[in-house]
Design a protein with these regions (language model features):
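Active-site-proximal beta-alpha core segment in soluble small-molecule metabolic enzymes
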Residues: 1-134, 146-148, 156-159
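Short coil/turn connectors at secondary-structure junctions
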Residues: 2-3, 23, 51-56, 96-98, ...
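Conserved, mostly hydrophobic/aromatic
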Residues: 20, 59, 101, 137, ...
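Glycine-rich beta-strand-to-loop/alpha-helix junction loops that act as flexible
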Residues: 105-106, 135-144, 172-174
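Short glycine/threonine-rich loop-to-helix capping motif typified by GTGT followed
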Residues: 111-116, 144-155, 179-185, 189, ...
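Acidic/histidine-enriched ion/cofactor-binding microenvironments in catalytic or ligand-binding pockets
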Residues: 123, 129-132, 151-163, 249-262
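Charged (often Lys/Glu-rich) extended helix/loop segments that serve as interaction or gating elements
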Residues: 170-309
Length: 309
């Protein structure tokens, strides 16, 4: 690839590890038991790699410092979390061959939460950083957000580099495509039961599962909070799942069958997490160009549904 390639998983299968040691530069283990299982394979990896360099091994840490509110499903520091080694479970006697430490505890957060997390990490694990080559502080950093505390981040990185002999890594995955992508839907029907309900050709369960899992309310072009404007509707889907509801929105004008509604900030996770529950079609993928023209990149049909079975 010509670039560094890092990988983490809560556990690895042996057949996967045999390939990973050939193509990954950093391999991070979720437990010392997993590290012990593949320690020799990592140590001998230079023999099977094109660059003739052994992989750099890391251990994922759980600093047990929750900074998230409202979406526990994305909190690796929550109760009984399986992700990362706690201070109680840390094995200093097994650190031979370990070159890095890793934590990933944030989700769509600012730099002040990263500082809080690092301080908790440093208090429990800082003494081991002097023996490491790198520190990976994971993802969840909204560094492209308008109000992101960039100076706070810079100050923290400078402190780490001046205090410990480590290279610092960040993984701002979502931030790279923040507020990008649209999901264009059509109103198929309008029914009434306590309130007006729009039946869309899109689905929270199939096309934006984070709406139900996180949960969260996706931004909608020309849509407002329920009750804020004159016309309020519940947006739902064509599946048989009663709870397949995207949310309640209000509009300045009444919505009619055949209208298009456009959800925003849909690039993140939309393709990797979608599914065909109930036979719901996958949304086509189109490219909106700067001149306003649209290029259809990929469309999906029955064969795609069939081949996933």
């Amino acid at each position: 690839m010509g670039k560094e390639n890092h990988v983490f998983a809560p556990a690895y299968k042996e057949k996967d590890m045999e390939e990973l040691v050939q193509i990954c530069d950093h391999i991070i283990f979720n437990s010392f038991a997993q590290y012990e299982k593949y320690k020799e394979m990592c140590r001998e990896s230079a023999k099977v790699r094109k660059d003739k360099k052994a992989v750099s091994v890391g251990i994922r840490i759980n600093p047990q410092c929750s900074t998230q509110e409202g979406h526990e499903i994305y909190d690796p520091c929550g109760y009984a979390s399986r992700l990362g080694v706690t201070e109680e479970q840390f094995r200093e006697d097994l650190l031979e061959g370990v070159e890095g430490l890793h934590f990933h505890t944030l989700c769509e957060q600012n730099a002040d939460d990263l500082v809080t997390t690092f301080q908790a990490f440093e208090k429990k694990f800082g003494k081991y950083l002097h023996r490491m080559k790198w520190l990976n502080m994971g993802g969840g950093h909204h560094i492209t957000r308008e109000n992101y505390q960039m100076e706070t981040l810079k100050k923290l990185i400078r402190y780490i580099r001046e205090t410990y002999p480590v290279e610092v890594y960040l993984e701002p995955g979502e931030a790279i495509a923040l507020n990008a992508g649209y999901l264009v839907t059509e109103v198929m029907d309008i029914v009434h039961n306590d309130m007006d309900i729009l039946i869309l050709d899109a689905s929270a369960a199939c096309h934006m599962p984070d709406v139900l899992e996180m949960p969260y309310r996706p931004p909608l072009a020309k849509g407002f909070e329920a009750g804020e404007k004159q016309y309020t509707y519940r947006l739902s889907s064509m599946t048989c799942l009663a709870g397949d509801v995207i949310g309640d929105y209000s509009f300045e004008q009444p919505i009619r069958i055949g209208d298009q509604l456009v959800f925003e900030d849909m690039a993140i996770y939309s393709m990797v997490k979608n599914n065909t529950f109930n036979g719901m079609p996958l949304p086509g993928i189109a490219l909106l160009k700067e001149d306003g023209s649209v290029e259809m990149v990929r469309e999906f049909g029955y064969d795609d549904f069939k081949m996933r079975l």
